[in-house]
């Protein structure tokens, strides 16, 4: 058997019907579309049009708003930071900043910086320079003799 010997099973596929090639073909003149009207024309559907009925996107109410003063922190747990230290991606001698965390692949850059959360176990004494931290994270860091400096988050408009 060769590649050029392979073919579909007989009767498994049907060749497409060429329409509009004379009335003798059976699909001439109106090409199987019936007679006049919107459905006989090309480009039948008007997106979102429901025949004059109020469309669903106008029937449903608008909801919520985007708060320009909200803070969007990238949350990182202490256990995740310890994993990066164990893998040799974070240097314990240098302060842990958002740039260091992004470079280590611990998190992506967030609009308002990083928030450290206390889930997991931290074994190394570290100095943190981050936008925010939970009470449990601060307690765990200070218990090991480390320190944490909370930076004031820069507004997104100031970066542009």
UniProtKB/Swiss-Prot annotation:
Disulfide bonds: none annotated. Residues 1-14 have a biased composition (Polar residues). Keywords: Ribonucleoprotein, Ribosomal protein, RNA-binding, rRNA-binding. The keyword RNA-binding applies. GO terms for cellular component: cytosolic large ribosomal subunit. Residues 1-35 are annotated as: Disordered. Binds to the 23S rRNA. Part of the 50S ribosomal subunit. This is Large ribosomal subunit protein uL15. It comes from Beijerinckia indica subsp. indica (strain ATCC 9039 / DSM 1715 / NCIMB 8712). The gene is rplO.
């Amino acid at each position: 058997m060769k590649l050029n010997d392979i073919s579909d099973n007989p009767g498994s596929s049907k060749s497409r019907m060429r329409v509009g090639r004379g009335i003798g073909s059976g699909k001439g003149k109106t090409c199987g579309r019936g007679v006049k009207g919107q459905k006989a024309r090309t480009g039948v559907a008007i997106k979102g049009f429901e025949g004059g009925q109020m469309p669903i996107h106008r029937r449903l109410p608008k909801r919520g708003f985007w708060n320009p003063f909200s803070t969007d922190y990238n949350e990182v747990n202490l256990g995740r930071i310890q994993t990066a230290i164990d893998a040799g991606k974070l240097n314990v001698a240098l302060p842990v900043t958002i740039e260091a965390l992004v470079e280590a692949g611990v998190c992506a850059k967030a609009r308002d910086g990083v928030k450290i959360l206390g889930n997991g176990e931290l074994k190394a004494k570290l100095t943190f320079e981050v936008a925010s931290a939970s009470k449990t994270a601060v307690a765990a860091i200070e218990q090991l003799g480390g320190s944490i400096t909370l930076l004031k988050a820069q507004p997104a408009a100031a970066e542009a």
